[in-house]
């Protein structure tokens, strides 16, 4: 990032960088607030800030009784149900960049941070587009997919990422993907009871039983 022209890079600790959007954004805003940042700029599919602000305010003060009643259906569905009275906002929670942007704004409000949220409309491929495009910007999903398939930096990848990124990727001897890590997860699941798995962060609402059932 520094070689690409960024002035300062702040690390989001691994503990928070690997969490869901809510925890990710809480930690990120906390760091920015401490650094006295004035703006938080994020990409979004629509480039519209007003609807994202409306959703963030609704999520900041949800109907707690409603959430408790619907807990078994999961947080994503709860979020959608919370917006039933404002159906025009529901399409905005269907996109990954919108979801993170909403959580950034919610975190700013929750922490009373003097930070101005700004959004830039995403250009090029959508986040989940799986093919490299010849013009415009390719998605991170497409770049990762091709990198894991080819196991090297091809000319297509070179055209899709900054020069310094391509150089760093060329130095990697072994690209680790989920298939590489899955056997270790299998061992963990096989050697631990459901009650033990339940002690892990965000493993709740019976998901430990489903994990034991579907992972041999």
Residue ranges and their predicted role:
Residues 8-216:
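Active-site cores that bind ATP or allylic diphosphates and position pyrophosphate for catalysis
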Residues 2-3, 105:
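Histidine-anchored nucleotide/phosphate-binding helix
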């Amino acid at each position: 990032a520094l070689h690409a022209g960024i002035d300062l890079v702040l690390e989001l600790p691994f503990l928070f960088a690997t969490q869901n959007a809510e925890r990710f954004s809480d930690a990120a805003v906390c760091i920015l607030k401490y650094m006295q940042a004035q703006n938080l700029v994020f990409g979004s599919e629509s480039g519209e800030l007003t609807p994202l602000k409306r959703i963030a305010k609704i999520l900041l003060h949800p109907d707690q009784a409603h959430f408790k009643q619907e807990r078994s259906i999961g947080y994503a569905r709860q979020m959608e149900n919370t917006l039933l009275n404002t159906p025009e906002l529901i399409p905005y929670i269907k996109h990954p960049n919108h979801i993170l942007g909403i959580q950034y704004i919610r975190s700013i409000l929750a922490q009373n941070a003097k930070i101005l949220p700004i959004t830039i409309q995403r250009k090029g491929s959508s986040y989940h587009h799986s093919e490299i495009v010849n013009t415009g910007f390719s998605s991170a999903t497409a770049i990762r997919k091709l990198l894991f398939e080819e196991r090297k930096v091809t000319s297509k990848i070179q055209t899709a990422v900054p020069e310094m990124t391509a150089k760093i990727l060329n130095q990697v001897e072994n690209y680790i993907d989920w298939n590489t890590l899955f056997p270790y997860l299998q061992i963990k699941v096989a050697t631990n009871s459901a009650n033990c798995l339940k002690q892990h962060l965000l493993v709740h609402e019976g998901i430990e039983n489903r994990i034991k059932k579907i992972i041999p």
